[in-house]
């Protein structure tokens, strides 16, 4: 899931080095730093890992960018965290504990993320961590592991496909899969000439190499490949090169205000006509829509935009519980465009599911200790033969109290964890309506992706 910080180094060179460095310092204590790590719920610090109920507060830490070029990611995740924990608290909490959410600002930079995480642990270990985007995951996931804290992360980095981190879980696909999905979308639309325009941050750049490979395998032509400096205020040079290449479609991810500026200039240099755009799932976001629609026009964007996204529920009991929990937070969130976009935003959907999975696992294990409840995450997510399917914490807790085995299926659909704790489903094609509502235009089959070599 694209996320982020600029680097000109190969990420495959950078990530192992960062992981090694993080492992080296993970046990060195919680020394330095005064990065942002403020409680979003105004509640108590995190609770210790107790083995039974006791009324103390369990903290869910949202470790993600709240400032910087990717500063919209953390707040999106926090809305989902508040929704999930409020619903859990309304059902009585976990083993007598209520939950709260705490923001930890990584600023989208490993150099800021590691000290911010140490500061977080210095103030009390969280019971669960969410967020951890591609900006900082490689540097902070080893620290989470050293502190034996379960995390549900949004990183799409391919390294997590084949490196085992026992406390790490992921409900979103690697960026490689998304690149193939975007290419399949372009091929299905009959586009022949493709341009790439991705931000110079870590998360966005992870899409580029697999996209180039997928475009070649699909028999399409790559006519331009431009990197957008997210600290820049104009992209006229990059836009001019792409306009001159005459692509049928532009595949892109550039978060923050950059995308709006780039697409505005590209439209101007293309004779006032917007070139069709295929975005990553990160572009399904209230903030992204609000800025880009204001720049190019809501109707123009609706006619020329699509994005890949994981298939999510849009009706039924899981969707109803999720929608109710999310809309309960609406009045607490500032103006971010169409609030209903949160119901399909990957970070909102899959982190909500992650929090519910962890809470139900604690309930099943009768313990908030990670060593005790971790095995139940996969047991409850993947289910066992004869397990009762539940769609919320409240219904899951009731079934567990009745002595039943359960399988949790939330708005993100059923899970299927592999040996690396990854679980990713099928892709759908999303579009925006002129009012900013997300609509599903269709699905991508496994056969379509495999035809490109995925």
Each model region followed by its residue ranges:
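Extracytosolic ligand-binding ectodomains
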Residues: 2-22, 26, 30-454
């Amino acid at each position: 899931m694209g996320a982020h910080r600029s680097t000109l180094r190969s990420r495959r060179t950078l990530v192992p080095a960062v992981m090694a460095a993080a492992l080296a310092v993970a046990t060195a204590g919680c020394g330095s730093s005064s990065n942002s790590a403020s409680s979003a719920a105004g509640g108590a610090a995190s609770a210790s890992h107790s083995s039974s109920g006791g009324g103390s507060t369990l903290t869910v830490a949202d470790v993600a960018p709240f400032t910087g070029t990717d500063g919209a990611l953390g707040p999106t995740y926090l809305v989902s965290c508040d929704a999930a924990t409020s619903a859990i608290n309304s059902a009585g909490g976990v083993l007598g504990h209520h939950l709260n959410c705490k923001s930890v600002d990584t600023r989208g930079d490993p150099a800021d993320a590691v000290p911010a995480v140490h500061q977080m642990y210095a103030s009390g270990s969280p019971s669960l961590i969410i967020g951890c985007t591609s900006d900082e995951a490689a540097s902070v996931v080893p620290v989470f592991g050293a502190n034996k804290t379960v995390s549900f992360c949004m990183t799409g980095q391919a390294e997590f496909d084949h490196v085992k981190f026992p406390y790490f879980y992921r409900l979103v696909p690697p960026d490689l899969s998304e690149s193939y999905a975007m290419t399949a979308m372009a091929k299905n639309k009959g586009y022949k000439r493709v341009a790439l325009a991705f931000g110079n941050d870590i998360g966005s750049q992870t899409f580029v190499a697999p996209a180039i490979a997928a475009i070649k395998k699909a028999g399409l032509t790559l006519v331009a490949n431009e990197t957008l400096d997210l600290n820049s205020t104009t992209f006229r040079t990059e836009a001019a090169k792409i306009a001159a290449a005459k692509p049928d479609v532009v595949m892109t991810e550039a978060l923050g205000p950059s995308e709006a500026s780039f697409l505005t200039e590209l439209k101007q240099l293309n004779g006032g006509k917007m070139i069709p755009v295929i975005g990553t799932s990160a572009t399904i976001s209230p903030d992204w829509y609000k800025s880009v629609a204001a720049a190019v026009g809501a109707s123009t964007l609706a006619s020329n935009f699509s994005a890949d996204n994981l298939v999510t529920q849009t009706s039924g009991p899981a969707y109803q519980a999720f929608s109710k929990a999310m809309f309960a937070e609406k009045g607490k969130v500032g103006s971010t465009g169409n609030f209903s976009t949160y119901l399909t935003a990957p970070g909102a959907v899959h982190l909500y599911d992650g929090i519910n999975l962890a809470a139900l696992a604690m309930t099943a294990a009768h313990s908030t200790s990670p060593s005790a409840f971790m095995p139940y995450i996969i047991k409850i997510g993947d289910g066992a033969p004869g397990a009762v399917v539940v769609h919320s914490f409240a219904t899951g807790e009731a079934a567990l109290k009745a002595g039943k085995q359960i399988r949790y299926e939330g708005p993100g659909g059923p899970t299927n964890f592999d040996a690396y704790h990854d679980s990713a489903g099928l892709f759908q094609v999303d579009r925006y309506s002129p009012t900013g509502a997300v609509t599903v235009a269709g699905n991508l089959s496994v056969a379509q992706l495999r035809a490109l070599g995925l």
